[in-house]
């Protein structure tokens, strides 16, 4: 059966996306492991001193979390827009299974975390920490299985993680906003309106959008809303079409910017974030940290809540006819992928940093995230390896 170029192009886009993200996941794993080693070595003090060094108005850690991660969210926004308008999420039938599964994977971990921490208002602020899936890390683990896993499951995991990221962006914007500065918020709205007008007027040069996005980031940073939201808003204003009324092609501003950012984000920005934020010094910490409700809520929310929430919601959607099971996938394979959804790392640590100001609570958050993500990665990988066989080529 012959396929037109337009029919095959979204698949090739997703394949390139998967390749980039899975390779980036390996880089993230290495960066996180290196951070843990350095933070517990004779170089520990130098590591933390460098991260707290001020460069202009912000510390190095703040530049990473507020500026570099805004670029990460810019790429996330570009991927979300492309997938909704021209990719795997362009039709409602394709959105149903990952959408329902993503909702289950956000709600149940939050319930489990809250059940452990409802008695402490300071801790319950972190309810969203175990609700995220790290797309790079999860696809990195999945890539280690090669041809054992049907491509439909890789697409399912990628689209679910994209919707998960969208939920995280909304959660950050609504629930993790500090005291609002109305003048700066007004400036942010003005910058967003300028970007919108440029889009409607058919401006096809990237530079004006990047300048407008930088202005938007400055205003959002000082408004009290987290600066990374600026990255997503900017992405949504960048045109997907090469010209108004023309079919989409790879020369459109969105495709050009997405292609330019994919590898720097996967191999530079995300590993830098992992190296800067995964470093936990275990000096002074004892076994009681693992029994703390904050650590347990995050760890079990990721490891238990994610897999049960994702798989349970997917099973219900398929059994009720709301969605179809991924082509060529078995129930146990779908469950294995649901286990991998408990790898929260980047977004979970990021939300944890927004939730808790104290060093101890941040350390407990990171331990919970690392434990829950590690268990999910190991168990998901072992399960999928045991129940699948590589395809003969």
Swiss-Prot record:
Lineage: Bacteria, Pseudomonadati, Pseudomonadota, Alphaproteobacteria, Hyphomicrobiales
Database matches in PANTHER family: NA(+)_H(+) ANTIPORTER NHAA (PTHR30341:SF0), SODIUM ION/PROTON ANTIPORTER NHAA-RELATED (PTHR30341)
A Pfam match: Na_H_antiport_1
Stored InterPro entries: Na/H_antiporter_dom_sf (IPR023171), NhaA (IPR004670)
Reactions catalysed, as given in the entry: Na(+)(in) + 2 H(+)(out) = Na(+)(out) + 2 H(+)(in)
Alphabetical UniProt keywords: Antiport, Cell inner membrane, Cell membrane, Ion transport, Membrane, Sodium, Sodium transport, Transmembrane, Transmembrane helix, Transport
One annotated GO biological process: regulation of pH
Bilayer topology annotation: Multi-pass membrane protein
Reported function: Na(+)/H(+) antiporter that extrudes sodium in exchange for external protons.
Any single Gene Ontology cellular-component annotation: plasma membrane
Cellular localisation: Cell inner membrane
Record GO terms (molecular function): sodium:proton antiporter activity
Designated name of the protein: Na(+)/H(+) antiporter NhaA 1
Keyword Zinc (UniProt): no
Transmembrane segments annotated in the record for this chain: 23-43, 58-78, 96-116, 126-146, 155-175, 178-198, 224-244, 265-285, 298-318, 334-354, 367-387
Family as reported in the entry's similarity comment: Belongs to the NhaA Na(+)/H(+) (TC 2.A.33) antiporter family.
This protein's record includes keyword Zinc-finger: no
